[in-house]
Amino acid sequence: TWTVVEAKLAETWSPEQISGHFKANGQAGVSHEAIYQRIYADKRRGGTLHRTLRCQKTRKKRYGARERRGTIPNQVSIEQRPAIVDARTRFGDWEGDTVIGAAHQQALVTLNERTSRYCLIAHVPAKTAQAVSDAVISLLTPFADCVHTLTTDNGKEFAQHERIARTLGADFFFAHPYASWERGANENMNGLIRQFFPKKCRFDSITQKDIAHAMDRLNHRPRKCLGFKTPHEVFMTQLHLRHNSVALQT
């Protein structure tokens, strides 16, 4: 059992995720408290298991959080977003944002589906509206029939929201300024992404392999809010249900 636990820690699973995954799959496991005790005992012996734990620092505002001069034309407020999006009962409602590299150079576009917490990540050479809209469209086009809405903050990088909405056949909404809690899942995801790409990381050195690795790790971690299923499991199940439903209607 401990061999499995240590393997999952190496995959950046938290002790609670490991314990919950054991229980959810009917396997004999250990409590998350016992895992923490083993980690700290290992640290006292000079071990390195503690390095697998996520850093619990006080959240700071993201760089550029207040670079919101001017108004994006034709914005649609989150206040007009259907209530079903808040309920998280419909598959295909997405949140989006950007994560900035060191010295504000280059960025990552991050998207997550609200019901499954499934995330998509793309690197952009600059945080321009053109580059960001290209990335969003590229990421979501394979799932275009499962994109009902997209909600972002008021960053100017989302100025081409009408192009994104038109291309994907989706509705685009903007959260209130400085109200990150209105996109809580995406904000949380960005914090997890920083585990792989810290604030001091220069994004010009990031490869597609690095991004694929981060997405794989994040989408294959069991989540307590998903009954300790992984985002990948929930997303793929919903995707298959959607496609089967469409097939039956044709």
Where are each of the predicted segments found?
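Secondary-structure boundary/capping micro-motif
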Residues: 1-177, 181-185, 190-202, 216, ...
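Charge-patterned, long linear interaction tracts outside catalytic cores
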Residues: 230-250
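Conserved active-site loop/cleft motifs that coordinate metal ions or position small ligands
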Residues: 204-205, 226-229
